[in-house]
């Protein structure tokens, strides 16, 4: 019996990517690339980092959403400031080699038909925000325009109201990143239900938190849990497989 798992419904999914206005003149812009693909342009560039902010972020079945990757950008951070779960039912990609971070404190679902088309590493988290050393934060729960956040991220911040459950991540998808890259799923309960995760020569980092806390990030996007952080369950069911060797 699996208890305490946050179950999300795929019914009545609004397949929509809607930028918010928290970045002002640097707001994200969604352009139709072709009949089945949207391109996300704009955003706020700070050194090697590109920041996007959305009221809602979903990828519908049989569609693709790709982030533009400007020159010199090595990390793309995408936060959801609205109140809805992100349903990734199609292809989520990057037009370049930047690492992609998807941040939605409400929860994230990867449906059976979801896939990644990235050349870098990928991280999905229900954290409230990401810390950049002493430079500051990029927060989904207290959104503002990013200041001088030019360094690599240093920690995921879970600042939910005390005694309020941290929302989870569910995947039924085959999710892959290229050779030597890493894939991170970090939230409350992590449920991999018939999912297939492939990171040939890289790492899979799965982390579940039961309470508020800070999870540090190393220079390879690896997770560093403090001993006093209460951990939540991670479920791998219905033939879920995780492959880091490059062999099947």
Where are these regions (language model features)?
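Extracellular and secretory-pathway beta-repeat/beta-biased strand scaffolds
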Residues: 1-248
